Regions:
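Class I S-adenosyl-L-methionine-dependent methyltransferase catalytic core
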Residues: 1-216
Length: 216
């Protein structure tokens, strides 16, 4: 008997395999619009997609493309992986030390509005290129920026629903360790996040009603 699929894991490869098992009939990712160096696939047993894109290609076979304007026809793929940047700052925290390491690894946007607009536009583009019932796998992370709490996974879900997706599933990737700067300990006002999310969105007209809006 197959092992029960859980919603949490310390291993993102396990999460991706679980998503493919539950939600992608052929078990394959067709397109990765933010491929980077292929960390989801290298040595994991997960088959790399045929279509690999990145704004700044770093690996062989990756084409230069913006996730908001992909060189794909409408309704041409069945499953897309999207792992966008999650940082946005102009502050001193990313100019040296741990902050600079994070910047080099993950990329950074100038402000939260630009970052989240990128998310929304990329979601719309994913909806354009996915076939009916196609799957968008969206990795995202909440964070604190300039003392404010940004629940990005909530924003992502809301934008996906507006674009025409159904939130079919969500997985939580747990971390045992995080890069932490001294100033983050000295000035801590919020819990340090040791998790991120893998949303599973299906291109579908299915809608969920959580409450009756009519007055009674």
């Amino acid at each position: 008997m197959s092992e029960l699929v859980k919603s949490i894991s310390y291993d993102q490869s396990e999460i991706i395999r679980s998503i493919l098992r539950l939600h992608v009939p052929n078990g394959r990712i067709d397109c990765d619009s933010t491929y980077s160096t292929g960390g989801f696939y290298n040595g994991t047993g997960i088959e790399p997609p045929e279509l690999k894109y990145d704004l700044y290609p770093q690996a062989e076979g990756v084409q230069k493309a913006d996730a908001r304007t992909l060189p794909l026809a409408d309704e041409s793929i069945s499953c897309m992986m999207f792992d966008p940047p999650f940082l946005a700052t102009k502050g001193e925290s990313l100019k040296a030390g741990v902050g600079n390491i994070i910047n080099r690894r993950f990329g950074v946007y100038p402000d939260e509005q630009s970052l989240h607009r990128f998310y929304a536009d990329a979601i719309k583009e994913a909806h354009r290129v996915l076939k009916a019932e196609g799957i968008l796998i969206f990795k995202c992370q909440d964070k604190v920026s300039s003392g404010k709490q940004y629940m990005s996974h909530v924003f992502v879900m809301n934008e996906a629903v507006k674009a025409g997706f159904y939130p079919a599933d969500i997985f939580i990737l747990l971390a045992k360790n995080r890069l932490i700067a001294d100033w983050q300990i000295r000035n801590q006002k919020h819990a340090r996040k040791y998790h991120c999310y893998f949303w599973v969105f299906r291109k579908s007209d299915l809608q969920i009603t959580y409450a009756d809006d009519q007055e009674k």
